[in-house]
């Protein structure tokens, strides 16, 4: 039903064809980008669905599906948070109007009071899970934690297992951040990563290999050139490093960690903090 304040006219709006309500734990009206929407959650497949009223006069509704990858097994989470009983934690999915955007919030909370927000991650519309960022300002959390970076760590542990042989790490020197635009890399670490790179030869390394470096926290990516130097037989990130350095605001003394995701053939920046519980 709709009510026009100016004309004081009441009209009936034909609702969308919804699936069997018994499949869902929750159905509610909400707001999506200023439009009336119906949200269904809790069908057990790590997803929820929204029907948005596009045109009240024509009774036109659009549908959006938020499919959440099942990366919340919670065993690494329970381990890191030192929770005694994994069964005390449940997954919940909801759309929260307080975000002020058309994003959806996924959170995991204890099944019984007190309800502390254990972690949350915002899922961009039309994803799934294209962008990750924290929702700390919305909730009162019961511990000191940087939510967005902790979520990234959990995903890494689940999807990539954080193989130490696939990580290149370095504390930046003055030479790394000066105007020459080169990052000198630890030789042994690069050699370890090269074992997982396809079709890499000494000749191609001398010429330079173009690689992608992804910042999954900010949803940015950079194109860099990995090269070996003939004179010293060591490795550098050459072209592209300067742009990446300035974009990330890296300074002398900062640590940079790059994880080689050999399945997707790209580096992932691991610059997150490990301070979980005081």
Swiss-Prot record:
A single GO cellular-component term on record: nucleus
Signal peptide: none
Subcellular localization, as worded in the UniProt entry: Nucleus
Positions of the DNA-binding region: 168-275
Alphabetical list of InterPro entries matching this protein: B3_DNA-bd, B3_domain, DNA-bd_pseudobarrel_sf, F-box-assoc_dom_typ3
Record-annotated disulphide pairs: none
Broad class of the protein's primary localization: nucleus
An MF annotation (GO) of this entry: DNA binding
Name of the protein in question: Putative B3 domain-containing protein At2g21920
UniProt keyword DNA-binding, yes or no: yes
Organism field: Arabidopsis thaliana
Keywords: DNA-binding, Nucleus, Transcription, Transcription regulation
